[in-house]
């Protein structure tokens, strides 16, 4: 079990770091930049190390799974997604940026 937890922890860190590396370059052509360091600003004008909705939603998903003894509870998961989207939970400094989810009737109807 410890090995599985360590693998999960490594995957979560890898996701968050990779996401933060990519945030400044989102929507840019792959050949238009060289990512050599963690930088800030760029596409979303966020500080270096800021992750996006991808990591926030992964954290909300994991929080739901852990809170429900690793069972999928769709309603709980949706509540956690809404906590991210509307209250800034799982987001750095509570700042939700670049989210089209607030305009999506499928996500807002569950609120």
Give the positions of each predicted feature:
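Structured, active/binding-site neighborhoods that engage oxygen-rich ligands
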Residues: 1-111
């Amino acid at each position: 079990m410890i090995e599985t937890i360590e693998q999960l922890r490594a995957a979560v860190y890898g996701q968050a770091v990779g996401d933060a590396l990519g945030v400044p370059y989102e929507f840019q052509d792959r050949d238009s930049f060289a990512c050599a360091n963690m930088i800030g600003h760029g596409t979303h004008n966020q500080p270096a190390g800021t992750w996006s909705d991808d990591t926030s939603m992964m954290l909300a998903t994991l929080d739901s799974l852990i809170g429900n003894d690793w069972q999928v509870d769709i309603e709980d998961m949706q509540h956690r997604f809404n906590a991210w989207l509307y209250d800034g939970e799982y987001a750095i400094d509570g700042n939700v940026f670049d989210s089209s989810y607030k305009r999506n009737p499928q996500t807002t109807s569950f609120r």
